[in-house]
């Protein structure tokens, strides 16, 4: 019998039924086709995907908001490999400096935010009022010089407040902070973990899907 792995998969599978940002022009799709290899009797299955680089669990690169910013294929491979801290946020509206101050965040930390958002994927539809990082919270995290931010919904900024959506992204990715969006922390407790999160290597990409896993430390 194989021993149970300590690793926890915190990424969401890509599928046509997955929750996606309503303003993305094309919903994700994965279509499988089976055919026979020419000259043989062997059947193989191959799939074709239609996805936006921000569908599902993904990493934002600076290029997402800055035309001359670093692209996803320029991300150092070890940027999101190593110690990470899961912080549980109690505020059901936004992530604010007042609550962040309780957690003694240190320079260089990789911080993953677990919020009430982790229960929203169970609903099977996009929730507009998800917990996001407030503009002040983004400035606080920038000033703390964190290296990575992860959140358990489709964006770090607000869906309803587009000024916040833009500002939060610019403050964080514009200061060399890598952002992981749409991670599944529903089965993860607050605490210290080892993280491995590697994006697909898309040339000149503004973002890319990633497989993210955690192991308790």
State each model region's role:
Residues 1-217:
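Active-/binding-site microenvironments in catalytic and ligand-binding cores
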